[in-house]
Protein backbone atom coordinates (compact mmCIF):
# COMPACT_ATOMS: atom_id res chain seq x y z
CA UNK A 1 0.00 0.00 0.00
CA UNK A 2 1.12 3.53 -0.76
CA UNK A 3 -0.95 6.15 1.05
CA UNK A 4 -1.52 9.74 0.04
CA UNK A 5 -0.10 10.96 3.36
CA UNK A 6 2.89 8.66 2.99
CA UNK A 7 3.45 10.04 -0.51
CA UNK A 8 3.53 13.58 0.84
CA UNK A 9 5.98 12.63 3.60
CA UNK A 10 8.16 10.71 1.17
CA UNK A 11 8.24 13.71 -1.12
CA UNK A 12 9.53 15.83 1.73
CA UNK A 13 12.18 13.29 2.62
CA UNK A 14 13.35 13.01 -0.98
CA UNK A 15 13.45 17.15 -1.84
CA UNK A 16 16.44 -19.98 -1.87
CA UNK A 17 13.75 -22.62 -1.87
CA UNK A 18 9.97 -22.38 -1.96
CA UNK A 19 8.18 -22.70 1.36
CA UNK A 20 5.00 -24.79 1.37
CA UNK A 21 2.25 -23.22 3.51
CA UNK A 22 1.07 -25.18 6.53
CA UNK A 23 -2.60 -26.01 7.11
CA UNK A 24 -4.52 -23.15 8.65
CA UNK A 25 -5.26 -23.98 12.27
CA UNK A 26 -6.63 -21.89 15.11
CA UNK A 27 -5.18 -21.32 18.57
CA UNK A 28 -6.19 -24.14 20.90
CA UNK A 29 -7.98 -21.81 23.29
CA UNK A 30 -10.67 -20.90 20.74
CA UNK A 31 -11.55 -24.48 19.86
CA UNK A 32 -14.44 -24.99 22.26
CA UNK A 33 -15.85 -27.74 20.05
CA UNK A 34 -13.26 -29.87 18.22
CA UNK A 35 -15.69 -30.41 15.33
CA UNK A 36 -16.38 -26.71 14.75
CA UNK A 37 -13.89 -24.58 12.86
CA UNK A 38 -12.73 -21.58 14.87
CA UNK A 39 -14.33 -18.23 13.93
CA UNK A 40 -11.04 -16.38 13.70
CA UNK A 41 -7.37 -17.28 13.75
CA UNK A 42 -6.26 -15.03 16.58
CA UNK A 43 -4.18 -12.45 14.72
CA UNK A 44 -3.16 -9.99 17.46
CA UNK A 45 -4.60 -7.06 15.51
CA UNK A 46 -7.61 -8.71 13.86
CA UNK A 47 -8.44 -11.83 15.90
CA UNK A 48 -11.75 -12.47 14.09
CA UNK A 49 -10.16 -12.60 10.64
CA UNK A 50 -9.86 -15.96 8.97
CA UNK A 51 -11.33 -19.26 10.06
CA UNK A 52 -9.99 -22.52 11.41
CA UNK A 53 -10.55 -26.12 10.46
CA UNK A 54 -9.88 -26.01 6.74
CA UNK A 55 -7.69 -24.59 4.02
CA UNK A 56 -8.94 -23.13 0.72
CA UNK A 57 -7.07 -24.30 -2.36
CA UNK A 58 -8.98 -22.41 -5.08
CA UNK A 59 -11.63 -19.72 -5.57
CA UNK A 60 -13.89 -19.81 -8.65
CA UNK A 61 -16.23 -16.81 -8.85
CA UNK A 62 -19.07 -16.23 -11.31
CA UNK A 63 -20.40 -12.69 -11.03
CA UNK A 64 -23.05 -10.61 -12.77
CA UNK A 65 -22.94 -6.85 -12.15
CA UNK A 66 -25.36 -4.16 -13.27
CA UNK A 67 -23.57 -0.81 -12.79
CA UNK A 68 -26.61 1.53 -12.95
CA UNK A 69 -28.37 -0.33 -10.14
CA UNK A 70 -25.25 -1.52 -8.27
CA UNK A 71 -26.70 -5.02 -8.28
CA UNK A 72 -24.24 -7.87 -7.83
CA UNK A 73 -25.19 -11.53 -8.20
CA UNK A 74 -22.56 -14.15 -7.55
CA UNK A 75 -21.79 -17.79 -7.08
CA UNK A 76 -18.55 -18.40 -5.21
CA UNK A 77 -17.18 -21.92 -5.49
CA UNK A 78 -14.42 -22.79 -3.04
CA UNK A 79 -12.27 -25.91 -3.20
CA UNK A 80 -11.01 -26.66 0.29
CA UNK A 81 -9.38 -29.34 2.44
CA UNK A 82 -10.53 -30.10 5.97
CA UNK A 83 -7.79 -29.88 8.59
CA UNK A 84 -9.95 -31.49 11.29
CA UNK A 85 -13.35 -33.18 11.64
CA UNK A 86 -15.93 -30.51 10.80
CA UNK A 87 -19.64 -30.37 11.40
CA UNK A 88 -19.59 -26.57 11.11
CA UNK A 89 -17.22 -23.88 9.88
CA UNK A 90 -17.25 -20.21 8.96
CA UNK A 91 -16.36 -17.96 6.04
CA UNK A 92 -15.69 -14.22 6.02
CA UNK A 93 -18.38 -12.32 4.11
CA UNK A 94 -20.17 -8.99 4.54
CA UNK A 95 -21.48 -8.67 1.00
CA UNK A 96 -25.01 -9.01 -0.42
CA UNK A 97 -27.72 -11.35 0.81
CA UNK A 98 -26.85 -15.05 0.79
CA UNK A 99 -29.52 -17.09 -1.00
CA UNK A 100 -28.14 -20.61 -0.68
CA UNK A 101 -25.07 -22.58 0.40
CA UNK A 102 -24.08 -26.10 -0.60
CA UNK A 103 -21.27 -28.31 0.64
CA UNK A 104 -20.26 -31.16 -1.66
CA UNK A 105 -23.36 -30.44 -3.72
CA UNK A 106 -25.79 -30.85 -0.81
CA UNK A 107 -27.76 -27.97 0.74
CA UNK A 108 -26.20 -26.69 3.95
CA UNK A 109 -27.56 -24.64 6.81
CA UNK A 110 -26.10 -21.14 7.03
CA UNK A 111 -26.35 -18.02 9.16
CA UNK A 112 -24.86 -14.53 9.00
CA UNK A 113 -23.15 -13.76 12.32
CA UNK A 114 -21.11 -10.88 13.69
CA UNK A 115 -19.73 -8.18 11.44
CA UNK A 116 -18.44 -10.39 8.64
CA UNK A 117 -19.07 -14.08 9.28
CA UNK A 118 -21.06 -16.68 7.37
CA UNK A 119 -21.54 -19.79 9.53
CA UNK A 120 -22.08 -23.01 7.55
CA UNK A 121 -23.28 -26.41 8.79
CA UNK A 122 -22.90 -29.19 6.18
CA UNK A 123 -25.54 -31.90 5.93
CA UNK A 124 -22.81 -34.49 6.52
CA UNK A 125 -19.68 -34.00 8.67
CA UNK A 126 -16.39 -33.41 6.88
CA UNK A 127 -13.42 -35.68 7.50
CA UNK A 128 -9.89 -34.39 8.11
CA UNK A 129 -7.50 -34.47 5.18
CA UNK A 130 -10.24 -34.81 2.57
CA UNK A 131 -11.19 -32.20 -0.02
CA UNK A 132 -14.63 -30.63 -0.03
CA UNK A 133 -16.48 -28.11 -2.19
CA UNK A 134 -18.42 -25.06 -1.02
CA UNK A 135 -20.79 -23.02 -3.19
CA UNK A 136 -22.34 -19.77 -1.99
CA UNK A 137 -25.10 -18.11 -4.02
CA UNK A 138 -25.64 -14.43 -3.18
CA UNK A 139 -27.25 -11.34 -4.71
CA UNK A 140 -28.24 -7.78 -3.92
CA UNK A 141 -27.10 -4.20 -3.99
CA UNK A 142 -23.44 -3.82 -3.08
CA UNK A 143 -22.56 -1.30 -0.39
CA UNK A 144 -20.16 1.43 -1.47
CA UNK A 145 -17.21 1.08 0.93
CA UNK A 146 -14.47 3.45 -0.30
CA UNK A 147 -10.96 2.63 0.93
CA UNK A 148 -12.05 -0.71 2.42
CA UNK A 149 -13.64 -2.82 -0.29
CA UNK A 150 -16.22 -2.43 -3.05
CA UNK A 151 -15.98 1.13 -4.37
CA UNK A 152 -18.23 2.88 -6.88
CA UNK A 153 -16.32 4.90 -9.48
CA UNK A 154 -17.33 8.29 -10.96
CA UNK A 155 -18.47 6.67 -14.21
CA UNK A 156 -20.85 4.38 -12.34
CA UNK A 157 -18.51 1.41 -12.55
CA UNK A 158 -16.85 -0.17 -9.54
CA UNK A 159 -13.66 -1.76 -8.22
CA UNK A 160 -12.54 -3.57 -5.09
CA UNK A 161 -9.55 -2.41 -3.03
CA UNK A 162 -8.56 -2.19 0.61
CA UNK A 163 -6.00 -3.37 3.15
CA UNK A 164 -6.14 -5.36 5.36
CA UNK A 165 -9.75 -6.02 4.34
CA UNK A 166 -11.65 -5.73 1.07
CA UNK A 167 -12.46 -9.12 -0.45
CA UNK A 168 -15.27 -10.00 1.98
CA UNK A 169 -17.34 -7.12 0.59
CA UNK A 170 -17.76 -8.95 -2.73
CA UNK A 171 -17.16 -12.68 -2.19
CA UNK A 172 -16.98 -15.16 0.73
CA UNK A 173 -13.52 -16.39 1.66
CA UNK A 174 -11.11 -17.40 4.37
CA UNK A 175 -9.82 -13.88 4.89
CA UNK A 176 -6.29 -14.32 6.21
CA UNK A 177 -2.88 -13.97 4.54
CA UNK A 178 -2.10 -17.43 5.94
CA UNK A 179 -4.58 -19.08 3.57
CA UNK A 180 -3.48 -18.13 0.06
CA UNK A 181 -5.23 -19.85 -2.84
CA UNK A 182 -5.41 -19.74 -6.61
CA UNK A 183 -8.18 -17.57 -8.02
CA UNK A 184 -10.38 -17.16 -11.06
CA UNK A 185 -13.32 -14.89 -11.76
CA UNK A 186 -15.74 -14.47 -14.67
CA UNK A 187 -17.88 -11.35 -14.73
CA UNK A 188 -20.87 -10.53 -16.92
CA UNK A 189 -21.67 -6.84 -17.44
CA UNK A 190 -23.56 -4.75 -20.00
CA UNK A 191 -21.55 -4.84 -23.21
CA UNK A 192 -20.33 -1.22 -23.04
CA UNK A 193 -18.36 -1.96 -19.84
CA UNK A 194 -14.94 -3.60 -19.46
CA UNK A 195 -13.72 -5.88 -16.67
CA UNK A 196 -10.18 -6.23 -15.28
CA UNK A 197 -8.92 -8.49 -12.50
CA UNK A 198 -5.80 -10.36 -11.38
CA UNK A 199 -3.74 -12.69 -13.56
CA UNK A 200 -4.31 -13.48 -17.22
CA UNK A 201 -7.42 -12.66 -19.20
CA UNK A 202 -8.61 -16.00 -20.58
CA UNK A 203 -11.97 -15.04 -22.06
CA UNK A 204 -13.72 -11.91 -23.39
CA UNK A 205 -16.99 -12.64 -25.19
CA UNK A 206 -19.80 -10.23 -26.15
CA UNK A 207 -23.24 -11.36 -27.30
CA UNK A 208 -24.71 -8.05 -28.43
CA UNK A 209 -26.07 -6.95 -25.06
CA UNK A 210 -23.64 -8.30 -22.46
CA UNK A 211 -19.94 -9.04 -22.12
CA UNK A 212 -18.43 -11.89 -20.10
CA UNK A 213 -14.77 -11.60 -19.15
CA UNK A 214 -12.72 -14.23 -17.32
CA UNK A 215 -9.43 -13.80 -15.46
CA UNK A 216 -7.27 -16.50 -13.85
CA UNK A 217 -4.46 -16.29 -11.33
CA UNK A 218 -2.43 -19.49 -11.18
CA UNK A 219 -0.23 -18.48 -8.25
CA UNK A 220 -1.66 -18.36 -4.71
CA UNK A 221 -2.98 -15.02 -3.50
CA UNK A 222 -4.18 -13.55 -0.21
CA UNK A 223 -7.77 -12.34 -0.27
CA UNK A 224 -7.08 -8.62 0.14
CA UNK A 225 -4.80 -8.77 -2.92
CA UNK A 226 -7.62 -9.89 -5.22
CA UNK A 227 -9.59 -7.32 -7.16
CA UNK A 228 -12.13 -6.78 -9.87
CA UNK A 229 -12.62 -3.47 -11.69
CA UNK A 230 -15.48 -2.51 -13.98
CA UNK A 231 -15.30 0.70 -16.01
CA UNK A 232 -15.01 2.22 -19.48
CA UNK A 233 -11.32 1.35 -19.56
CA UNK A 234 -8.67 2.03 -22.14
CA UNK A 235 -6.00 -0.66 -22.27
CA UNK A 236 -2.23 -0.75 -22.67
CA UNK A 237 -0.63 -4.08 -23.56
CA UNK A 238 3.15 -4.50 -23.36
CA UNK A 239 5.66 -7.34 -23.10
CA UNK A 240 8.86 -7.60 -21.15
CA UNK A 241 11.99 -8.72 -22.96
CA UNK A 242 11.46 -12.25 -21.59
CA UNK A 243 7.93 -12.34 -23.03
CA UNK A 244 5.99 -11.72 -19.82
CA UNK A 245 2.70 -10.04 -20.84
CA UNK A 246 1.77 -6.77 -19.14
CA UNK A 247 -1.86 -5.63 -19.24
CA UNK A 248 -2.85 -2.24 -17.83
CA UNK A 249 -6.18 -0.43 -17.69
CA UNK A 250 -7.05 3.26 -17.39
CA UNK A 251 -10.39 4.65 -16.23
CA UNK A 252 -11.76 7.58 -18.28
CA UNK A 253 -10.12 10.30 -16.19
CA UNK A 254 -6.87 8.38 -15.65
CA UNK A 255 -5.55 8.07 -19.21
CA UNK A 256 -2.92 10.74 -18.50
CA UNK A 257 -1.08 8.15 -16.38
CA UNK A 258 -0.37 6.01 -19.44
CA UNK A 259 3.12 7.50 -19.72
CA UNK A 260 3.95 6.21 -16.23
CA UNK A 261 2.83 2.70 -17.08
CA UNK A 262 4.96 2.70 -20.22
CA UNK A 263 7.92 2.40 -17.82
CA UNK A 264 6.64 -0.80 -16.21
CA UNK A 265 9.02 -3.12 -18.15
CA UNK A 266 11.95 -0.97 -17.01
CA UNK A 267 10.70 -0.99 -13.41
CA UNK A 268 10.30 -4.77 -13.28
CA UNK A 269 13.74 -5.27 -14.84
CA UNK A 270 15.22 -3.04 -12.14
CA UNK A 271 13.42 -4.87 -9.34
CA UNK A 272 14.65 -8.23 -10.62
CA UNK A 273 18.24 -7.04 -10.20
CA UNK A 274 17.47 -6.52 -6.51
CA UNK A 275 15.13 -9.34 -5.52
CA UNK A 276 15.39 -12.08 -8.12
CA UNK A 277 12.99 -13.26 -10.82
CA UNK A 278 9.59 -11.61 -11.07
CA UNK A 279 7.29 -14.05 -9.25
CA UNK A 280 4.24 -14.02 -11.54
CA UNK A 281 3.29 -14.88 -15.12
CA UNK A 282 1.84 -11.45 -15.89
CA UNK A 283 1.81 -7.88 -14.62
CA UNK A 284 0.20 -4.52 -15.20
CA UNK A 285 -1.86 -1.93 -13.39
CA UNK A 286 -5.38 -0.58 -12.92
CA UNK A 287 -5.55 3.22 -12.89
CA UNK A 288 -8.83 4.38 -11.34
CA UNK A 289 -10.22 7.92 -11.25
CA UNK A 290 -11.81 7.69 -7.80
CA UNK A 291 -10.32 9.91 -5.10
CA UNK A 292 -8.66 7.09 -3.16
CA UNK A 293 -6.41 7.76 -0.20
CA UNK A 294 -4.06 4.95 -1.22
CA UNK A 295 -2.75 2.84 -4.06
CA UNK A 296 -2.65 -0.91 -3.44
CA UNK A 297 -0.45 -3.81 -4.56
CA UNK A 298 -3.26 -6.08 -5.79
CA UNK A 299 -1.44 -9.14 -7.10
CA UNK A 300 -0.02 -8.84 -10.64
CA UNK A 301 -2.03 -5.66 -11.27
CA UNK A 302 -1.90 -2.88 -8.63
CA UNK A 303 -4.75 -0.41 -8.15
CA UNK A 304 -3.51 3.17 -8.63
CA UNK A 305 -5.15 6.34 -7.29
CA UNK A 306 -5.30 9.51 -9.44
CA UNK A 307 -2.33 11.08 -7.61
CA UNK A 308 -0.02 8.18 -8.55
CA UNK A 309 3.51 9.09 -9.61
CA UNK A 310 6.62 7.10 -10.57
CA UNK A 311 7.52 6.55 -6.92
CA UNK A 312 4.12 4.93 -6.37
CA UNK A 313 4.49 2.57 -9.34
CA UNK A 314 7.93 1.45 -8.13
CA UNK A 315 6.55 1.03 -4.60
CA UNK A 316 3.54 -1.09 -5.59
CA UNK A 317 5.54 -3.31 -7.92
CA UNK A 318 8.15 -3.93 -5.22
CA UNK A 319 5.25 -5.39 -3.27
CA UNK A 320 4.88 -8.10 -5.89
CA UNK A 321 7.93 -9.60 -4.14
CA UNK A 322 7.55 -8.11 -0.64
CA UNK A 323 3.90 -8.56 0.30
CA UNK A 324 2.32 -10.55 -2.52
CA UNK A 325 4.56 -13.49 -3.40
CA UNK A 326 5.91 -13.41 0.17
CA UNK A 327 3.12 -12.37 2.54
CA UNK A 328 3.00 -11.51 6.21
CA UNK A 329 2.22 -14.15 8.80
CA UNK A 330 0.50 -11.63 11.07
CA UNK A 331 -0.30 -7.98 10.48
CA UNK A 332 2.32 -7.04 13.07
CA UNK A 333 4.86 -8.18 10.43
CA UNK A 334 3.87 -5.32 8.11
CA UNK A 335 7.42 -3.92 7.99
CA UNK A 336 8.35 -6.82 5.72
CA UNK A 337 5.94 -5.37 3.18
CA UNK A 338 6.10 -1.64 3.57
CA UNK A 339 9.65 -1.05 4.79
CA UNK A 340 11.05 -2.77 1.71
CA UNK A 341 8.62 -1.22 -0.77
CA UNK A 342 9.33 2.23 0.66
CA UNK A 343 13.10 1.76 0.76
CA UNK A 344 13.16 0.53 -2.82
CA UNK A 345 11.06 3.40 -4.18
CA UNK A 346 12.49 6.17 -1.98
CA UNK A 347 16.17 5.19 -1.89
CA UNK A 348 17.22 2.48 -4.33
CA UNK A 349 15.45 3.78 -7.44
CA UNK A 350 16.66 7.39 -6.87
CA UNK A 351 20.18 6.15 -6.13
CA UNK A 352 20.60 3.74 -9.03
CA UNK A 353 18.35 5.24 -11.69
CA UNK A 354 18.61 8.97 -10.95
CA UNK A 355 22.05 9.33 -9.37
CA UNK A 356 20.81 10.73 -6.05
CA UNK A 357 23.10 10.82 -3.00
CA UNK A 358 20.92 8.77 -0.68
CA UNK A 359 23.47 8.75 2.14
CA UNK A 360 23.15 12.51 2.27
CA UNK A 361 19.37 12.22 2.10
CA UNK A 362 19.45 9.76 5.01
CA UNK A 363 21.58 12.07 7.17
CA UNK A 364 19.37 15.07 6.38
CA UNK A 365 16.26 13.09 7.30
CA UNK A 366 17.75 11.91 10.60
CA UNK A 367 18.86 15.46 11.43
CA UNK A 368 15.38 16.80 10.64
CA UNK A 369 13.46 14.33 12.78
CA UNK A 370 15.94 13.35 15.46
CA UNK A 371 14.41 15.65 18.07
CA UNK A 372 10.81 15.02 17.01
CA UNK A 373 9.38 12.52 19.53
CA UNK A 374 6.32 11.82 17.39
CA UNK A 375 8.52 10.54 14.56
CA UNK A 376 9.89 7.78 16.81
CA UNK A 377 6.89 7.08 19.04
CA UNK A 378 5.54 3.98 17.22
CA UNK A 379 7.74 0.87 16.95
CA UNK A 380 8.48 -0.48 13.47
CA UNK A 381 7.87 -4.05 14.53
CA UNK A 382 4.43 -4.54 16.05
CA UNK A 383 3.20 -0.95 15.61
CA UNK A 384 -0.29 -1.83 16.88
CA UNK A 385 -3.72 -2.35 15.34
CA UNK A 386 -4.77 0.64 13.28
CA UNK A 387 -1.18 1.93 13.17
CA UNK A 388 0.24 -0.58 10.68
CA UNK A 389 0.36 1.96 7.87
CA UNK A 390 2.24 4.77 9.60
CA UNK A 391 5.94 4.69 10.47
CA UNK A 392 6.75 1.77 8.15
CA UNK A 393 6.76 4.32 5.32
CA UNK A 394 9.02 6.87 6.99
CA UNK A 395 11.28 5.08 9.49
CA UNK A 396 11.25 1.83 7.54
CA UNK A 397 13.57 3.13 4.80
CA UNK A 398 15.89 4.61 7.42
CA UNK A 399 16.15 1.25 9.20
CA UNK A 400 16.99 -0.61 6.00
CA UNK A 401 19.53 1.98 4.90
CA UNK A 402 21.28 1.76 8.26
CA UNK A 403 21.16 -2.06 8.09
CA UNK A 404 22.63 -1.95 4.60
CA UNK A 405 25.57 0.12 5.83
CA UNK A 406 26.08 -2.12 8.84
CA UNK A 407 26.22 -5.30 6.72
CA UNK A 408 27.72 -3.82 3.56
CA UNK A 409 26.26 -4.01 0.05
CA UNK A 410 28.00 -7.30 -0.73
CA UNK A 411 26.04 -9.00 2.05
CA UNK A 412 22.86 -6.93 2.21
CA UNK A 413 21.56 -7.19 -1.35
CA UNK A 414 22.12 -10.92 -1.97
CA UNK A 415 20.73 -11.70 1.49
CA UNK A 416 17.51 -9.76 0.90
CA UNK A 417 17.01 -11.51 -2.43
CA UNK A 418 17.58 -14.93 -0.85
CA UNK A 419 15.08 -14.24 1.92
CA UNK A 420 12.23 -13.15 -0.31
CA UNK A 421 12.89 -15.93 -2.82
CA UNK A 422 12.95 -18.55 -0.05
CA UNK A 423 9.42 -17.50 0.95
CA UNK A 424 8.04 -17.33 -2.58
CA UNK A 425 4.26 -18.01 -2.54
CA UNK A 426 4.39 -18.39 1.24
CA UNK A 427 4.56 -16.30 4.40
CA UNK A 428 7.25 -14.77 6.58
CA UNK A 429 7.43 -13.08 9.98
CA UNK A 430 9.58 -10.35 11.50
CA UNK A 431 11.04 -12.57 14.27
CA UNK A 432 12.18 -14.99 11.57
CA UNK A 433 13.69 -12.11 9.58
CA UNK A 434 15.60 -10.89 12.63
CA UNK A 435 17.03 -14.35 13.24
CA UNK A 436 17.99 -14.60 9.58
CA UNK A 437 19.86 -11.30 9.73
CA UNK A 438 22.02 -12.56 12.59
CA UNK A 439 23.18 -15.50 10.45
CA UNK A 440 24.70 -13.04 7.98
CA UNK A 441 27.36 -11.56 10.23
CA UNK A 442 29.47 -12.30 13.33
CA UNK A 443 28.51 -8.84 14.60
CA UNK A 444 25.92 -9.07 17.38
CA UNK A 445 22.82 -7.41 15.93
CA UNK A 446 20.56 -7.64 18.98
CA UNK A 447 21.08 -4.08 20.15
CA UNK A 448 20.89 -2.60 16.65
CA UNK A 449 17.65 -4.42 15.80
CA UNK A 450 16.07 -3.64 19.16
CA UNK A 451 16.87 0.06 18.79
CA UNK A 452 15.44 0.27 15.28
CA UNK A 453 12.53 -2.17 15.43
CA UNK A 454 11.35 -2.10 19.04
CA UNK A 455 12.42 1.34 20.22
CA UNK A 456 10.23 4.43 20.52
CA UNK A 457 13.12 6.89 20.75
CA UNK A 458 15.94 7.62 18.29
CA UNK A 459 18.58 4.87 18.14
CA UNK A 460 22.00 5.75 19.57
CA UNK A 461 24.55 7.30 17.20
CA UNK A 462 26.33 3.98 16.72
CA UNK A 463 23.11 2.51 15.29
CA UNK A 464 21.99 5.65 13.46
CA UNK A 465 25.29 6.01 11.63
CA UNK A 466 26.89 2.57 11.17
CA UNK A 467 29.66 1.89 8.69
CA UNK A 468 30.36 4.66 6.18
CA UNK A 469 27.30 6.63 7.31
CA UNK A 470 29.50 7.83 10.17
CA UNK A 471 31.77 9.59 7.69
CA UNK A 472 29.22 12.19 6.61
Task: Please provide the spans of the model-predicted regions.
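Surface-exposed beta-strand/loop patches in extracellular or lumenal glycoproteins
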Residues: 75-96, 171-174, 183-190, 431
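Beta/coil-rich, acidic/histidine-enriched accessory regions frequently appended to metallopeptidases
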Residues: 53, 422-472
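N-terminal, polar/Ser/Thr-rich
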Residues: 1-2, 6-7, 22-73, 154-157
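Zinc-dependent metallopeptidase catalytic helix centered on the HExxH motif
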Residues: 178, 300-360
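Glycine/proline-rich low-complexity spacer/linker segments in large multi-domain proteins
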Residues: 128, 137-184, 233
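A surface-exposed beta-strand-loop module
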Residues: 89, 93-153
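Hydrophobic helix-coil surface modules that form long, contiguous segments used
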Residues: 74, 176-314, 343
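Acidic/His/Gly-enriched intrinsically disordered linker/tail segments
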Residues: 218, 338-407, 450-455, 459-461, ...
Amino acid sequence: MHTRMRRLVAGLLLAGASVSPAPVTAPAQVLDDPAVGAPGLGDPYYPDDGNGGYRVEHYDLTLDYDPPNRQLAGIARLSAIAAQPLRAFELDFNGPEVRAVTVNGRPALFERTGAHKLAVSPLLPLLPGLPFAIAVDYAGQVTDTPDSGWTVSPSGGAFAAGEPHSAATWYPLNDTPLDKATFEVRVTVPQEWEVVSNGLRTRDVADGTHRTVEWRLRDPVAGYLTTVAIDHFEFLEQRRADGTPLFSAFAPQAVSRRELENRLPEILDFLETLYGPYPFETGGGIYVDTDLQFSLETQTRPIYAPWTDLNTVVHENTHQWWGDSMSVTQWSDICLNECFASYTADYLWPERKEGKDVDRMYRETVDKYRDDPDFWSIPLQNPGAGREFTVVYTRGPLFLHALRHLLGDAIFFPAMSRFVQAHRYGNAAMPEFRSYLQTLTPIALGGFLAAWLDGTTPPPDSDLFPGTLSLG
